[in-house]
């Protein structure tokens, strides 16, 4: 224990701390200057006070010092127990088992360390490849391997600690065997009180032990050497560096590592024989080696007669008299302990010799005394014989003589003495018998006491067993009690639940009884409630039927409107073709040019003026507020005319038309030519390379613009002469056109039936060839100003343009006369279609209205184009062919749309019939369950079926023509922004109304749009659909029907 604890300053045994305080390792100077004391050398002799005064050659202080050292050594070994052979074998078996477990654990640790190293290398490789990022699975695998390594390392550390404890038990046993050699008999001649105390302490536990012979000592030394080898092998068990890194070294582990380090150094000293070359760091292991060597020499008995030597100097003794404990002091104390053992062994031998001599003398004296006793006994026997012989002689003498009296007195004396001796012998025998009987009784009582003690011990053991049994029974009963409590609580909960269920069932039974006991009185509360519920459901179904019928009529009206729109588009197309034929027949000096080749010298000019011409098709506003409101209400951003024309050609599905319209067509000078890029291209007045920048803007409400060229119709066109870099300025001219509201209304409604795709294609074709213009005959209600400011760089271009305008006056007069007739019919058709849109709330009709406005603007723009852009002719014949093809395609599409509307109406009617049949079947099942109310339910069902099967003709719908006539005054103020808002509102209110959302609103021209109030449009919508706002959408109708079903089931 002391040997194990003196190697480290971090952790110590508690016994050492109590005995020696806080130990510190010896300094290097102490280790260098301290010489281990060898009692077997010829120069060292320990002399105690038991020797004669002549042999004392040391001072009294040195003797006391050595006796104190010996006493401390014996005190240090006091707690070491002398084990029996059985205990030693058990300890050896445990050590063997732990060594096997240690070997297996070390092998596992080596394998786990290699696995951890491989996982670490994999993680590093992944981190290098992915620049610091690695997979989560690799990290988890490395952590798992590290955890296993730590667990095995801690397990190995615990096993080695247990092995060290068993090794220390064996070492303590061996030191106790050494101390057992000090017999108590040898301490009687020691006069020193310290040595007497030492002898008493050492003899307490080893009174019956005998002196060990040489064979036992040799066996003890061999066992010590084997334990030392095992301790050395413990230091070499772990060699894996990764394992040492994984273990976190605490105080106990550091202590074990220091022990291993010392053992490794000790092994190196044994193998390489470095005792002479050791420096100050290796002196402590060298002292351990010297200590073990001295022990082996002592137990082998090589030096039996050591001689006296001079005492150690006082300074060396003082070094060992410190309160701290170290390995050197421990060795020094054990040296003195062994010297005391040797001296007392010698004194014991001398005392034995003296005892033998005294025994011989005593035997001789005893023999002499026995001889004297035998002689005295013989003498007494002879005296007795002589006395008896004299008495017999006296009896033989005659009686007359006097000696007879003498003889009688002698006989009496002799009888008295014999009687006295017999009495004494009897008393002694009696006393002996009494003593023997008492001794026997004491022995019997002792045996009885021992048996009683054994019985009490057995009873105590039995009581302990009974107590354990009772405790186990108590715990078992307690567990059963807890289980019973749980079962009781569970049963209570079950009973409570059953009670609740019973109460609920009773309540239901009472309800059923009350329902069964209801009288047939029709005036009862139950019958009244049921009738009210059926009436409410009947009303709901009636309202639903009315809504569905109104929707059917709405779809039919939409179908009629589409047919009218398609007819109107066809009429407009024919009129357009007529106008184009008129322009083609004009014989002018300079032919018309509506576009330039795609890859000709004017391509750069086309690209420069695309944005400027797109501004023509989009409106300009008098203020920022107007611009903001209309831009917010538009459903999609305004596309340029090139994109519109591409969309129109793509919707028609003909790639050939697109290619023909997109490419330039070379024709003779007398034939006009139409191109897709005509609007977006620039028109030069003189054909030079550098074009004149022209801006075309539409200003409403007479917005004044500087540098503007006035545009007029007919013969009113005047182009003033200008010089170089001079800007033409003039006031904008208002263009008016009267609208005939009363004439041709019915005719326009019949003819105006445009389709969606025809509108797109035809409007795109017209807009690609003409500019925006206004006629002088437009009514005051539609007032817009069209100004075309032109920045002129070359005066030659201006002069040439003025000449071309003068040449085209005659053709324009003739075109205006034809155009006024077209505008009158188109504007009337516009008002009628607007009235239909307000009443029927259909988004496609609003788009058709916008498209018709674009057509009007396009036709009016023909005059402006004829005045301002007259350069080359185009192919009108190709445009006519394309228009005819588009008309055919639009008719096919309109037929498909009408068929789709019919299919949708049929599907809605079939869904309605299915729902009515489902409700009818549910009511029949519920009526079968109610036997009492069977007759009343049948009557209600019959009335319900009659109300559900309401014909569509019974529902009154307001005539759309009347609506259009009533709202004609208000329709003059309608704008497309309000119409788009209304269409959006209708979509949000009823998702089931599938309007045609494919109608493009991008081609709507806002130049001639007027404004209306939102309130008039909303009133018209409410008048047209009065009940749709109440019930919302078809989805809400379905939810209302399901709720009515639940009400009927609850009432049943």
From Swiss-Prot:
Keyword Cell cycle: yes
Region (Disordered): 616-687, 726-760, 788-820
InterPro entries, A to Z: Uds1
GO cellular component, one term: cytosol
Location of Phosphothreonine modifications: 60
Listed Basic and acidic residues bias regions: 670-679, 750-760, 791-812
Source taxon at top rank: Eukaryota
Polar residues composition bias: residue spans: 631-669
GO biological process, alphabetically ordered: mitotic division septum assembly
Cellular localization per UniProt: Cytoplasm; Cell tip
Presence of the UniProt keyword Metal-binding in the record: no
Alphabetical UniProt keywords: Cell cycle, Cell division, Cytoplasm, Phosphoprotein
Known role: Involved in septation.
Name of the protein in question: Up-regulated during septation protein 1
UniProt source species: Schizosaccharomyces pombe (strain 972 / ATCC 24843) (Fission yeast)
């Amino acid at each position: 224990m002391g040997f194990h604890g003196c190697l480290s300053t971090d952790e110590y045994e508690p016994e050492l701390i109590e005995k020696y305080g806080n130990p510190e390792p010896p300094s290097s100077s102490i280790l260098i200057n301290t010489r281990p004391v060898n009692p077997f050398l010829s120069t060292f002799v320990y002399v105690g006070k038991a020797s004669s005064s002549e042999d004392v050659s040391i001072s009294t202080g040195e003797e006391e010092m050595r006796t104190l050292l010996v006493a401390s050594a014996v005190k240090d070994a006091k707690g070491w127990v002398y084990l029996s052979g059985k205990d030693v074998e058990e300890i050896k078996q445990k050590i063997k088992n732990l060594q096997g477990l240690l070997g297996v654990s070390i092998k596992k640790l080596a394998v786990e360390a290699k696995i951890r190293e491989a996982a670490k290398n994999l993680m590093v490789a992944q981190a290098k490849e992915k620049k610091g990022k690695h997979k989560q699975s690799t990290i988890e695998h490395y952590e798992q391997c590290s955890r296993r390594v730590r667990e095995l390392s801690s397990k190995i550390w615990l096993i080695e600690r247990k092995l060290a404890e068993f090794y220390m038990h064996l070492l303590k046993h061996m030191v106790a065997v050494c101390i057992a050699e000090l017999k108590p008999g040898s301490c009687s001649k020691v006069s020193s009180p310290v040595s007497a105390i030492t002898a008493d302490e050492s003899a307490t536990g080893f009174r019956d032990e005998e002196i060990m012979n040489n064979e036992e000592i040799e066996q003890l030394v061999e066992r010590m050497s084997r334990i030392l080898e095992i301790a050395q092998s413990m230091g070499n068990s772990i060699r894996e560096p990764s394992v040492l890194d994984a273990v976190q070294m605490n105080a106990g582990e550091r202590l074990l590592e220091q022990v291993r380090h010392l053992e490794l150094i000790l092994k190196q000293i044994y193998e390489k024989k470095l005792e002479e070359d050791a420096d100050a760091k290796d002196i402590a292991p060298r002292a351990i080696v010297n200590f073990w060597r001295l022990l082996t020499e002592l137990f082998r008995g090589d030096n039996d007669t050591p001689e006296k030597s001079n005492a150690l100097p006082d300074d060396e003794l003082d070094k060992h008299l410190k309160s701290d404990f170290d390995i050197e002091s421990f060795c020094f104390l054990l040296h003195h302990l062994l010297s005391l053992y040797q001296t007392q062994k010698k004194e014991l031998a001398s005392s034995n010799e003296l005892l033998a001599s005294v025994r011989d003398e005593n035997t001789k004296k005893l023999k002499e005394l026995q001889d004297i006793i035998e002689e005295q006994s013989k003498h007494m026997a002879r005296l007795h014989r002589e006395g008896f012989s004299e008495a017999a002689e006296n009896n033989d003498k005659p009686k007359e003589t006097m000696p007879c009296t003498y003889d009688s007195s002698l006989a009496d004396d002799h009888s008295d003495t014999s009687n006295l001796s017999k009495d004494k012998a009897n008393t002694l025998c009696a006393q002996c018998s009494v003593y023997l009987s008492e001794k026997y009784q004491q022995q019997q009582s002792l045996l009885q006491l021992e048996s009683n003690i054994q019985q009490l011990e057995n009873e105590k053991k039995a009581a302990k067993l009974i107590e354990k049994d009772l405790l186990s029974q108590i715990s078992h009963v307690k567990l059963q009690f807890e289980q019973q409590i749980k079962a009781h609580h569970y049963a209570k909960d079950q009973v409570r639940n059953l009670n609740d269920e019973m109460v609920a069932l009773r309540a239901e039974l009472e309800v059923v009884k009350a329902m069964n006991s209801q009288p047939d009185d029709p005036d009862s509360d139950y019958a009244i409630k049921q009738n009210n519920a059926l009436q409410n459901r009947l009303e709901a179904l009636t309202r639903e039927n009315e809504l569905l019928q109104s929707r059917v009529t709405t779809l039919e009206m939409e179908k009629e409107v589409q047919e009218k729109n398609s007819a109107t588009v066809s009429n407009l197309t024919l009129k357009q073709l007529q106008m184009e034929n008129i322009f083609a027949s004009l014989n002018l000096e300079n032919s018309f040019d509506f576009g330039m080749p795609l890859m000709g010298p004017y391509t750069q000019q086309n690209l420069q003026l695309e944005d400027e011409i797109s501004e023509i098709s989009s409106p300009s506003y008098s203020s920022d507020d107007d611009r903001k409101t209309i831009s917010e209400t538009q459903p999609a951003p305004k596309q340029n005319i090139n994109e519109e024309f591409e969309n129109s050609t793509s919707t028609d599905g003909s790639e050939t038309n697109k290619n023909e319209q997109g490419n330039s067509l070379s024709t003779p000078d007398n034939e006009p030519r139409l191109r897709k890029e005509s609007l977006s291209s620039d028109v030069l007045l003189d054909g030079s390379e550098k074009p004149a920048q022209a801006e075309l803007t539409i200003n409403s409400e007479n917005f004044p613009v500087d540098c503007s060229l006035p545009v007029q119709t007919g013969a009113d066109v005047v182009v003033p002469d200008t010089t170089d870099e001079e800007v033409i300025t003039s006031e904008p001219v208002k263009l008016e056109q009267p609208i005939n509201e009363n004439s041709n209304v019915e005719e326009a409604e019949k003819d105006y039936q445009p389709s969606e795709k025809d509108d797109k294609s035809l409007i795109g074709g017209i807009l690609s060839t003409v500019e925006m213009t206004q006629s002088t005959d437009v009514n005051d209600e539609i007032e817009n100003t069209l100004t075309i400011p032109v920045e002129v760089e070359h005066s030659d271009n201006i002069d040439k343009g003025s000449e071309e305008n003068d040449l085209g006056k005659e053709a324009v007069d003739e075109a205006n006369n034809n155009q006024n007739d077209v505008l009158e019919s188109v504007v009337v058709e516009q008002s009628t279609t607007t009235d239909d849109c307000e009443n029927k709330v259909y988004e496609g009709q609003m788009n058709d209205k916008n498209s018709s406005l674009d057509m009007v603007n396009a036709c009016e723009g023909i005059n402006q184009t004829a005045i301002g852009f007259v350069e080359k002719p185009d192919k009108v014949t190709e445009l006519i062919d394309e228009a005819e093809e588009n008309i055919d395609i639009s008719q096919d599409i309109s037929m498909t749309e009408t068929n789709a509307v019919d299919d949708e109406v049929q599907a809605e009617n079939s869904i309605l019939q299915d729902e009515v049949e489902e409700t009818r079947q549910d009511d029949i099942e519920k009526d079968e369950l109610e036997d009492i109310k069977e007759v009343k339910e049948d009557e209600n069902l019959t009335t319900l079926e009659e109300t559900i099967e309401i014909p569509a003709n019974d529902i009154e719908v307001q005539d759309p023509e009347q609506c259009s006539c009533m709202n004609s005054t208000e329709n003059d103020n309608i704008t497309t922004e309000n119409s788009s808002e209304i269409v959006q509102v209708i979509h949000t209110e009823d998702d089931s109304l599938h309007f045609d959302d494919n109608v493009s609103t991008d081609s709507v021209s806002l130049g001639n749009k007027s404004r209306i109030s939102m309130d008039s449009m909303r009133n018209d919508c409410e008048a047209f659909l009065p009940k749709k706002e109440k019930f919302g959408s078809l989805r809400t109708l379905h939810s209302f029907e399901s709720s009515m079903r639940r009400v009927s089931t609850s009432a049943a």
